[in-house]
Amino acid sequence: MSLPDDSRYLKGGPVAQRIIAAVREDAAIAKAEGFPPKLISITVGDTDAVDVYVRNQRAKAQLAGIDFEERRFPATITSGELEAAIHGLNADPRVTGIIIQRPVPAHISVKTLQAAVHPLKDVEGMHPASIGNIVYNQLDLAPCTAAASVELLKETGLDLKGLEVVVVGHSEIVGKPIAFLLMSEGATVTVCHHLTRSVAAHARRADALFVAVGKPRLIKADMVKPGAAVIDIGINSEIGPDGTSRIVGDVDTDSVKDVASWITPVPGGVGPITVAILLRNTMVALSRQRALYEATYGTADRLAAE
């Protein structure tokens, strides 16, 4: 889908291309030094929607020079068997990062699987240790969607120090990490959720408004401060007047774009950057793994000298 040529739209494509270009340079250097980056994608069962994501991840990984391999498991597999497979990948030095594709069958806890991934191979930034590290301003392995959302806000050129930010939605992998990422940049952050008494009152005073709740067109123009930046992270399927399904966000873009100075389109905003962040995280993970390897066994130069 082509997006209108409107300066108010914060388009993710150009940002993603920039990130992937940098990753491609780093990956080429790592390969030349004998450390080729490799991603393993884990899919459980047959889900068409997952296949779309995997194809996109594979294509972008190839573009960045990162090896990508998919491991498929039957929907009948037990949680214990999957965890054992993940532990095997954790122990494989050829594997840089592990991706758990969602959804998984109801009898399996995706949180349990994510916790089974070693933090050094957690390129999605969803291991409890990775999320916890954000509190301590260790930000380079943050959850991909959260990091992508903040990346788009930075595209506005707004000074984040002291910026009044409101985050609508407080999930463990999007809303909460966004809040901590922004606080680390010096922003003043308010988080709204289903128990917040007046989301509109909070939203109207935000210089930057992030929305991730999964409710189509929740945010209307009268809830947005004039001149604000609006980052729409929602992805919802909606039946249009012609009976066809279309993707819309949590923001009523048609009305809000006339109030906000910047707004992310859905699709085409946060989404493209999310995969780019995944690839950038892969190189961060590889760097950490190499540092551990060299601390344990020494660098190639040191080993040769010995």
UniProtKB/Swiss-Prot annotation:
Q: In which pathway does it act?
A: One-carbon metabolism; tetrahydrofolate interconversion
Which residues does NADP(+) bind? Answer: 169-171, 235
For this entry, the protein name equals Bifunctional protein FolD 2
GO annotation, biological process: L-histidine biosynthetic process; methionine biosynthetic process; purine nucleotide biosynthetic process; tetrahydrofolate interconversion
Query: What does UniProt give as GO cellular component?
Result: cytosol
Q: What is its EC number?
A: 1.5.1.5, 3.5.4.9
Q: Which organism is it from?
A: Mesorhizobium japonicum (strain LMG 29417 / CECT 9101 / MAFF 303099) (Mesorhizobium loti (strain MAFF 303099))
Q: Which GO terms describe its molecular function?
A: methenyltetrahydrofolate cyclohydrolase activity; methylenetetrahydrofolate dehydrogenase (NADP+) activity
One Pfam annotation reads THF_DHG_CYH_C
Keywords for this protein: Amino-acid biosynthesis, Histidine biosynthesis, Hydrolase, Methionine biosynthesis, Multifunctional enzyme, NADP, One-carbon metabolism, Oxidoreductase, Purine biosynthesis
Task: Return the similarity comment.
Answer: Belongs to the tetrahydrofolate dehydrogenase/cyclohydrolase family.
Q: What does this protein do?
A: Catalyzes the oxidation of 5,10-methylenetetrahydrofolate to 5,10-methenyltetrahydrofolate and then the hydrolysis of 5,10-methenyltetrahydrofolate to 10-formyltetrahydrofolate.
Tell me the subunit arrangement: Homodimer.
Give the PROSITE patterns listed for this entry.
THF_DHG_CYH_2
Catalyses which reaction(s): (6R)-5,10-methylene-5,6,7,8-tetrahydrofolate + NADP(+) = (6R)-5,10-methenyltetrahydrofolate + NADPH; (6R)-5,10-methenyltetrahydrofolate + H2O = (6R)-10-formyltetrahydrofolate + H(+)
> Which Gene3D superfamilies does this chain map to?
Leucine Dehydrogenase, chain A, domain 1, NAD(P)-binding Rossmann-like Domain
